[in-house]
Regions:
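Intramembrane alpha-helical segments
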Residues: 84-155
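Multi-pass membrane catalytic core of lipid/isoprenoid biosynthesis enzymes
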Residues: 71-109, 203-227
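Membrane-embedded alpha-helical segments that form the functional core of polytopic membrane enzymes
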Residues: 22-63, 71, 95, 110-122, ...
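Transmembrane alpha-helical segments that form the membrane-embedded catalytic/substrate-channel core
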Residues: 49-57, 118-126, 168-187, 219, ...
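Interfacial loop-to-transmembrane junctions
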Residues: 83, 247-275
Length: 284
């Protein structure tokens, strides 16, 4: 058991929320001609709080399911450290504060933030027990933080520019090999709660094929900014080096289809995305 202060922190999944902030801020700096420190601050606070609120609502909704799984049974809600009313009040409060800070960036930024949270909490979360297609739905809020940062940096605030859309596309496709490998090596634990999130609902050849295929799609998407002249040859070389490494691990997983190989590909995916994002940010 732990304190309520720690419980509120765990409710936010603060480490994951900080990674989301990283994607948003890097995308903002990538797109903005003259990045402003004040906007970086607003985007960081707003992005963190909206993501934290989404995670908090998710844990309230999945309290009973989390209690069934080894990886989630020690969360604040299953342990009863926080009451439902406390968690909901906290989530609603940080939602309002988060939206305010995103509004300081732009109206479109706040709107996309609200849409992202709504999809995650009201559509993706209840859909997880019903169909593997939940992963497709969840990929949208998973990638929207990149779009939030990108549109904040645009010179035109009433539209979504092409490069912003490309950044979103990369992170959108990244969600699939990332989450499916997680679902592969946590298959038995997810099954306890009735979550069957692999493409074919089970660890089989079809699911392994889809993981490998979407890794190829991800690499193809990562090259698009070069093909459309947003970055130069140096960036392309770095992207190709990172991509060949990712494909190598994807091939090993495809060949052996073990939990160990799934974990290695999962870790490779985690490293791949920030490498690509930071490379695109340099515009070299």
């Amino acid at each position: 058991m732990y304190s309520k202060r720690k419980a509120f922190l765990l409710l936010t999944k603060h480490r994951l929320s900080l990674l989301v902030v990283f994607s948003a801020v890097v995308s903002y700096v990538t797109i903005a001609e003259s990045p402003k420190l004040s906007i970086v601050l607003y985007l960081s606070i707003g992005g963190f709080l909206i993501t934290a609120a989404s995670n908090a609502f998710n844990q309230v909704i999945e309290k009973n399911l989390d209690a069934l799984m080894t990886r989630t049974k020690d969360r604040p809600m299953p342990l009863g450290v926080l009451k439902k009313k406390e968690a909901l009040f906290f989530a609603f409060t940080i939602t309002l504060v988060g939206l305010y800070f995103l509004y300081l960036c732009s109206v479109l930024t706040a709107l996309i933030g609200l849409i992202s949270m709504t999809i995650y909490v009201l559509i993706y979360t209840p859909l997880k027990k019903k169909t593997p297609w939940a992963v497709f739905v969840g990929a949208f809020p998973g990638a929207l933080p990149t779009l939030i940062g990108a549109v904040t940096g645009q010179s035109q605030q009433n539209t979504i520019e092409f490069f912003s859309a490309l950044l979103f596309l990369i992170q959108f496709i990244w969600q699939f090999p990332h989450f499916w490998t997680l679902a592969w090596f946590n298959y038995d634990d997810y099954a306890k709660a009735g979550f069957y999130l692999l493409p074919n609902r089970k660890k089989d050849v079809f699911s392994a094929n889809m993981i490998f295929l979407y890794t190829i799609f991800l690499v193809a998407a990562a090259i698009l900014p070069y093909l459309f002249n947003f970055v130069g040859v140096i960036s392309l070389i770095i992207i190709l080096m990172a991509s060949f490494t990712l494909i190598f691990y994807a091939y090993l997983f495809y060949k052996y289809q073990t939990e160990d190989m799934a974990k290695k590909l999962f870790k490779a995916c985690i490293l791949y995305l920030p490498v690509i994002q930071l490379t695109l940010m340099t515009r070299l």
